[in-house]
Amino acid sequence: MSQSSTTTEIPQEARDRARSLGWEEGLIEIAIEQGHSLQEIWQALRGGVDGVRARQFLSGGGFVRPDPWWMKVPTEWGIRARAADPALGLSIQDLMVGTYGDVPDVWTNRTEIARGSFPATVGEDMGYTIFDKAIVWADCCVPLYEIAIRDRWISATDLDWASLEPLPAEQEKAVCQLMTELSERAYLEGAILSGWLPAISYGYLELKLFLSTVIYDLARHAETFRKRALANGGGLGLQAPTDYSRTVAESRSFVELMATLFVQDSMLLTLYESGDLIAQNPLEREMYRLCARDRQRYMDYQVERMKHFLFKTPERREEQQLYLNRAEAKLVRDWNDPAVSEPLALLLAGDSRRMDEGHRRLRELRKHQVSAYLANLQRTTITRKTLNGRLQDILNA
């Protein structure tokens, strides 16, 4: 036996692996005597080279290539995805071809397997809990993802912060109080959604991608509102009411969460769309416009998801009414908080000496918000049976 074989310490793990592959005793030592390093031997063992091929290799000096079994999996091959619109480039919609575009009603694999790939013999449970397409899916999430990526904006540079001019103290305080509330609501919703994202199984990849853009949008909104509060001689105001936020955070299922958020999301979209009424300068008008554009995408998903869910599970229609009842009650309670209503009324009035006019305009804005909310519900095929009494009073006023 050569000096190299006697001085090279062969790990027991390597011997055990060799034995499991059918290597005869002493074959590792022979390989070392022929000048092969322990690293090369490990590569052969990890590559699955069995004893017969190892002996052939060492006897003849030829290279034995491990069997490329991974090349033989029966996935759909020969795919050449092409951009439907070359101007927009290759989109995720363009990738939904053949079996790769088949989004099943129930995803049964609990691992990180990519849809369309071939499952390994053994895989670890990755903790997913949402496997039903009806719970999360909306076809619009595919194009909405592309739009979200295309329409992304940067608050630091896309808003002209240098254009801000001092406002009267009471107006600046009203703006900052509103910014405090809106920043908190955006932050909380993004945080809650990000906590649910890992529960959605990999089979609904496109939906997960879209929700990732929503979470990013909400983070940008929280950032932008905070910047506005701190950029013009003001500061943050009183913490926003937490009744509604706690209801959101306590949702026990994705279905409950989406129904609960539907109420606030619709109301906030209408508020942002009405930004010209409360903006005190061009920067704020542009801020509300950009936030409304982001919120519209999310609302489109909310509507289509609910519509798809009710179509697939009509027996759960009445359940949604319960969630909406609870959410509306919490929203009304928040709306009645002076820290929420007074700043809006002052901004709508333009002057604290015209607060009666400001409250009148606020009632008009609230009526518009409730009407738009009910219209969004109608798009999902839901008709509210017992709209919250105070919301009904707003409509009737």
Identify the role of each PLM range:
Residues S2-E206, V255, K312-A397:
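Terminal targeting/low-complexity segments that flank the catalytic cores of oxidoreductases
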